[in-house]
Amino acid sequence: MSNTLPHPSGSWRNRYLLMRHGHSLANQQGLIISHPDNGLTGYGLSPLGESQLEQLVAAWSWPTPTRVVHSDFLRTTETAARVARHFGLDTEVDVRLRERCFGALERQADSHYPAVWALDAQDPTHGEYGVESVASVAERLQAVIAELEETYLDATILLVSHGDPLQILLTALAGQPLSAHRDRPALTPASITPLG
């Protein structure tokens, strides 16, 4: 699945493929897994996620990546490894691509997400339930892009991250209010959004 983003003002030095990890065991179980204690070594790809990636690389229709950078959570690491292996690339970890931390909602049902998103729409700096604010997520993901822009030229960089962080990044890059990040169409597992 592919998504599109209006080209922001200015020109990019590189092309980016923003990828949400494949369907995970956390998705399968309907759980919020956002803390490194749980996400680094557990809740990797589900059988559906493995199948999604197999189909994705077999029918790849985006520019061929030259670098693969990913969150260090197991589900993103496995996703990145599968794509990188297909193209004969190594992977690179950047912890700034990690899942948004959902605080006290960790290991709770994912039916709690809408309550957080409703608060996000009122105040992108809120930290209710101990969640990481939308503003903080936007800052760290934009810093990844800024650093890559300074470091590389004419690269095609696959960034493998998580649903909320990528939604927030896309909202920020489009110049929209961060409070509107859930107004964007939801990024589905194993989807890719080209940028630049």
Label the predicted regions.
Residues 16, 153-163:
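Generic beta-sheet signal
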Residues 70-71, 139, 160-161:
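Short beta-strand scaffold positions
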Residues 28-32, 103-107, 171-172:
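Short aromatic-enriched loop/helix-cap "lid" or pocket-rim segments at secondary-structure transitions
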Residues 39, 44, 85-142:
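Phosphate-handling substructures
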Residues 24, 165-166:
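Short active-site segment of divalent metal-dependent hydrolases/proteases
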Residues 61-64, 148-155:
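Glycine-rich phosphate-binding loop signature in dinucleotide/nucleotide-binding domains
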Residues 176-196:
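Domain-level recognition of soluble alpha/beta enzyme cores
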Residues 2-15, 19, 23-87:
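Active-site-proximal alpha-helix that buttresses catalytic centers in soluble enzyme cores
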